[in-house]
Structure formats: C-alpha cells, structure tokens
C-alpha cells in the first residue's frame, strides 16, 4: 500500500468513526450538535488520529478497538481551530475550504461548540479499555499536551508575539527571548505537543515498550516542529484556495515565521533535518507495519 493509499484509507476510517459517534444533529439542543458536526465533518487531513493508528500498528497492535480513542484527537484539534478562528484570536473567516464555525453559527455558539468538542473528546478517551493504567497515562499525556504549558501556552505566546489589540504581555520571560527561541516555543507548544501526544497515545494503547515510547516521543517532537515550519512556508507560498484558509495572515499580523526569520532555504533545510531525525526514530520503533516515516515525509512535502 502506498503512503497516499494508506492515508486515504485511514482518513475514511476516522471519518466514519466521527460520523457514527458524534451526537446526531437532531439531538436537542439541535443548534450545538449541528455546529459540532459542521466543525468536525467538514474535511481535514486527520493527521493526529492517523499518527495514533500508525504508532499502534508499528507496535504490533490491532488498532480497530482503539479507533474511538484516536478519533478523540480530531475533536481536540477541531476545538482548537474553532476557537483559534474567533475574532478575538486569529479572526479567520475560512477553514478547510469553507466558512468558519463562528461565521455560520455566530460567536457565542462557536465558543460553546469548541467547549463541547473538548468535553466530548475526554468522554471518548475515558471509556474503559483493556489496561486502565496505560489508559490513564494516555489521558494525562493528551491533557498535558493541550494545557497552559502546552497548546494553550503556545497560543498565548503567539498572541504575545503578534501585538494583538488589548493584549499586553508582561516584561521579561518569552518577550525578552531571542525571536527564534520564541518562535520555536510557539511551534513546539501550539502545534507540536498534540502531535507528539498523538503518537504516544497510539503507543500506550498499542502496548509499546518503554524503548518504543521514547522513540515515539522523539519522532513526535521532530514531526511536530517540522509540521509547523512547513505551515509557515505554505502560508507565504500558497493561495487561500490551495490552503483552504486565508493565506498570508501571519505576515500581515506581524507574527514570527521561520522563513521570515531565517529565510526560505534555511527553513527548508531545517525541515529536512527534522525529517531525518523522525525517520531515524521511526526505524527504532520497528514493527510489522510501520508507516510513521512515510507519514513524516508526507507532512514535510504537503502543499496544503
């Protein structure tokens, strides 16, 4: 199976799980459930749950009983997008090639939609599974990845760096750090930690050894940073139609980017270095079916 075929098949599987397990649009109150389904089911690469599947497969596990846990990662990712698109944050009108949730349903319902998706995700993650100890470790891993020292912290640091209206960061700390240090902090936290938690979730529920978990963590850290550097490059190179979201917004908002700080060529070199690091660790994990390195290449070579 080629990488493209693997990704397409796993994406269809995740889409089915999401479709079947999200509350039906007819469930009262219908407005919130319509908005949740609109936000989640409107496309997307499903990279986070696919990485979890790939990690579990590499560890020799049957991923089918674990799909709902892995699909929860997409709920978390979508919650972050719904909130990130709000006027108070990135103020974006388009996501995944169509109008953002707050444009269609209003800001108040969009906020509640994000809240509901995050809550639903942890409901899915906490359903009983084979090994309660490993499941608890997995839940803590995901929760820590998105807390104020993870994804939320990265979002705050991103706001601090953008000079957002009404947002006055304290002196010192990240504000005093070198620009590249601040940017790496944003990327590793806002995007990278949930990607890392995705492969760790797959490993923990897939009965990975400690050595495999260590390699998965190194793989995730490398791919997480590479993913966001590629996003920086695409933001300046692709059109809004190609990206499915507004292009060029980071530069327009005065945000730090890798090509803006070190140039396009050096940014691409850094992506290549991170891909090599990820591939090296994917090989350490081994396994009968291991698509981690090919997925890493896809992440680094994607055009949207």
Provide a role label for each language-model segment.
Residues 1-23:
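N-terminal amphipathic/basic leader segments beginning at the initiator methionine
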Residues 13, 22-281, 287-300:
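Mg2+-dependent prenyl diphosphate-binding active-site environment of isoprenoid biosynthetic enzymes
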């Amino acid at each position: 199976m080629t990488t493209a075929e693997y990704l397409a098949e796993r994406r269809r599987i995740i889409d089915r799980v999401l479709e079947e397990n999200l509350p039906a649009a007819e469930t009262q109150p219908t407005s919130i459930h319509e908005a949740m389904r609109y936000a989640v089911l409107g496309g997307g690469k499903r990279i986070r749950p696919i990485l979890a599947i790939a990690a579990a497969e590499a560890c020799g596990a049957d991923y089918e009983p674990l799909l709902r846990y892995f699909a929860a990662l997409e709920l978390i990712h979508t919650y972050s997008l719904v909130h990130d698109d709000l006027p108070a944050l990135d103020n974006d009108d388009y996501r995944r090639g169509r109008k953002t949730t707050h444009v269609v349903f209003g800001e108040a319902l969009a906020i509640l939609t994000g809240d509901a998706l995050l809550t639903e995700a942890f409901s899915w993650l906490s359903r009983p599974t084979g090994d309660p100890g490993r499941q608890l470790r997995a839940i803590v891993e995901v929760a820590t990845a998105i807390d104020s020292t993870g994804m939320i912290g990265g979002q705050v640091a991103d706001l601090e760096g953008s000079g957002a209206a009404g947002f006055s960061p304290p002196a010192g700390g990240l504000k005093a750090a070198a620009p590249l240090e601040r940017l790496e902090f944003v990327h590793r936290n806002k995007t990278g930690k949930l990607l890392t938690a995705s492969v760790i979730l797959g490993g923990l529920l897939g009965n990975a050894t400690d050595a495999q978990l260590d390699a998965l963590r190194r793989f995730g850290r490398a791919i997480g940073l590479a993913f966001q550097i590629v996003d920086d490059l695409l933001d300046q190179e692709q059109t809004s139609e190609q990206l499915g979201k507004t292009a060029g917004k980071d530069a327009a908002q005065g945000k730090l980017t890798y090509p803006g700080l070190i140039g396009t060529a050096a940014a691409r070199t850094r992506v290549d270095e991170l891909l090599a690091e990820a591939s090296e660790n994917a090989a350490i994990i081994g396994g009968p079916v291991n698509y981690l390195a090919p997925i890493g290449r896809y992440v680094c070579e994607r055009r949207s």
